[in-house]
Amino acid sequence: MSLPALRRVKPENLHLTLAFLGHTPDERLDDVSGAAADAAARVSPFTLSFDRAGRFPDRGRPRVVWLGIAEGEASVLELGVGAYAGLRSRSLRFDERPLAPHLTLARVAEDASSAEAKTVGAAIDELAIPELRFEVGEIAVIQSVLSPKGPRYTSLATAPLAHN
């Protein structure tokens, strides 16, 4: 099925966001990296798998198509708790909305017609999810730069998960 209203996330850009900081001065990178290291130290390596598709918002015109976590959600949430605590302790500003772990697959184009958006919504309900499993051994601090061609992500630092 062709869904021209969807802007798919490039495979190399797929990620789970633990905390979104927005613009952060370069001189705070060590603090951000420290917060990531603190979070990673709380959690052992784990398996992450996905089992369902969904959309934001749940009703009305879809804007985001995502995959939901089947296995590993508790570990992702614990990483989020650790990241939030580390960022707060370093007086870093970030979006403190509750973490809703998901993997964004696509966004619905803002100029999509109502019919196209409705087709996307119906397609999500029919989407068969293949088994997707990953071993998670580290987290990364990622810089996102938006451009007309889409976001460009650069890894600035990584932090290995705890090895118990």
Language model segments and positions:
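Histidine-dependent nucleotide/RNA phosphoesterase domain, centered on the 2H-phosphoesterase fold
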Residues: M1-N164
